Amino acid sequence: MKEMVDYGIIGFLIFLSVIVIAIAIERLWFFATLRVDDYTDRRKLELALHKRLTLVATIGSNAPYIGLLGTVMGIMLTFMDLGSASGIDTKAIMTNLALALKATGMGLLVAIPAIVIYNLLVRKSEILVTKWDIFHHPVDTQSHEIYSKA
């Protein structure tokens, strides 16, 4: 049972980290090949830019909880083993508790880069939308100078 919890939680967190990496690579490739002047509607551009970013944010915000779930389950199994054993083996208890805590560490190891990646991708999206605005609504320098003198 302990191995199932351990491998299940850690395996799921590794799977989530692979998803985040795949989305990051796909988005960076999309951003690199994007031409903002190909879009005539800002809303369509924003939809294209924000594709799959919600999934990255969801993984980043929930990975610590998944790791915590693994820790809680590991601690519960340790207490069950402790309750069913006739003697107290301090070494086994400490080893099991340490192994249970690695799930929380793994959750944080997935969450922190996922949130950083999400923030970088959102910022890049904002920059591209601003470039679209500049391309489609250039500032008339003469009228801008007239209004700034008034």
Curated annotation (Swiss-Prot):
What are the protein's UniProt keywords? Cell inner membrane, Cell membrane, Membrane, Protein transport, Transmembrane, Transmembrane helix, Transport
Database matches in InterPro entries: ExbB/TolQ_transport (IPR050790), MotA_ExbB_proton_chnl (IPR002898), TonB_ExbB_2 (IPR014172)
List the subcellular locations: Cell inner membrane
Q: Which Pfam families match?
A: MotA_ExbB (PF01618)
Per the record, the GO terms for biological process are: protein import; transmembrane transport
| Main location, first listed in the record | membrane
> Which positions, given as ranges, span the membrane?
5-25, 63-83, 97-117
Membrane topology according to the record: Multi-pass membrane protein
Q: Which GO terms describe its cellular component?
A: plasma membrane
Similarity remark: Belongs to the ExbB/TolQ family.
Recorded protein name is Putative biopolymer transport protein ExbB-like 2
What is the species listed in this Swiss-Prot or TrEMBL entry? Helicobacter pylori (strain ATCC 700392 / 26695) (Campylobacter pylori)
